[in-house]
């Protein structure tokens, strides 16, 4: 079975690197984007199995990224997990309208995020 490809979108290079290392150690193939425009371009190019998306990005809002991706037939079924420092309660309406699948507030618990990734991908939790 091929590795699941996960697009990590965050303007913080340290977060991208850390998540990439952790996900790669669990058998996932991480790909990266640091802003809204590259997120859409990378998604088109890489066709990831899942997207981890920050909301506060250069060159556009994370919700606009979700809306653009969900509007593309080739990408509309890709699960999107938002990982942001924003307050999820304050973001609730926009989050629901965007079509994103889950919301984690930074700092997040990596094991909980991993469980959400596995559920979204329909894979068994790694031992």
Over which residues does each language-model region extend?
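Alpha4 helix (beta4-alpha4-beta5 surface) of REC/receiver domains from two-component response regulators
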Residues: 64, 87-104, 111, 115
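Active-site beta3 strand of CheY-like receiver
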Residues: 46-52, 57
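Charged docking surfaces used in two-component/phosphorelay signaling
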Residues: 17-25
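Residue-level signal for the "D+5" position in two-component response regulator receiver
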Residues: 32, 57-60
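Short hydrophobic/Thr-rich beta-strand motif most characteristic of the beta2 strand and flanking loop
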Residues: 27-34, 42
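Acidic catalytic/metal-coordinating carboxylates
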Residues: 35-38, 61-67
